[in-house]
Design a protein with these regions (language model features):
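Active-site beta-loop-alpha junctions enriched in small/polar residues
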Residues: 1, 15-19, 45-51, 73
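Alpha/beta enzyme core
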Residues: 1-40, 58-65
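Hydrophobic faces of well-ordered beta-strands that scaffold small-molecule active sites
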Residues: 12-14, 40-46, 68-70, 87
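Glycine-rich phosphate-binding active-site loops on the catalytic face of alpha/beta enzymes
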Residues: 16, 63-80
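Short glycine/serine/threonine-rich phosphate/pyrophosphate-binding segments
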Residues: 50-55, 69
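C-terminal helical cap(s) of enzyme catalytic domains, especially alpha/beta-barrels
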Residues: 76-106, 110
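A mid-to-C-terminal "edge-of-domain" accessory segment
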Residues: 96-168
Length: 168
């Protein structure tokens, strides 16, 4: 990094190429790099081999990372990359980061990529999965009826979706 910085480079991509980091290691590494090189812009590129990519992105941003790499539906080699929809929701809700992403279009973009790539979106995929905003009759559905007793920021309308109910 020192040699590249001295030659004029100002932006660096720090990858977790093998997807082996966890949020604690990601935060420590990013914090060290941002402290050592406060004038540089660091991006983080996470792979999802341990299903930790979105959490690692959050850790990187909280530690000073200024850019992140994502993929629609997490599509990427091996276990994929950090899913755009998950990262958007996490960064907005947990790090109060503003982006120019129009959340109400994430579902449409995801289904377009699904149909063009042939890679199915799991029904329980956060934000964009078919069943994510479906409540089964019971405690959760009852909470919806009680003036959103079990309220959270992941409302289906935010993502251009509607709450559905199923008998189970």
């Amino acid at each position: 990094v020192d040699a590249l910085k001295d030659s004029g480079a100002k932006r660096f991509m720090l990858p977790d190429t093998l997807g082996i980091l966890n949020p604690q290691l990601t935060a420590a590494f990013m914090s060290m790099m941002c402290s050592r090189y406060p004038d540089l812009h660091f991006d983080f590129h996470a792979h999802n081999d341990y299903d930790l990519a979105p959490g690692n992105v959050l850790a990187a941003v909280l530690a000073g990372c200024r850019g992140v790499h994502t993929a629609v539906n997490g599509v990427g080699e091996r276990a994929g990359n950090a899913a755009l929809s998950s990262v958007q929701a996490i960064l907005k809700d947990h790090a109060h980061v503003r982006t120019n992403i129009r959340e109400e279009n994430l579902g449409k973009v995801s289904t377009t990529v699904e149909s063009m790539s042939g890679i199915a979106i799991p029904p329980n995929e956060p934000i964009v999965g078919e069943n994510v905003f479906t409540q089964v009759a019971g405690v959760h559905a009852d909470g919806d009826k009680k003036n959103n007793l079990y309220c959270n920021d992941l409302l289906p309308e935010r993502f251009g979706r509607k709450r559905e109910y199923a008998l189970g």
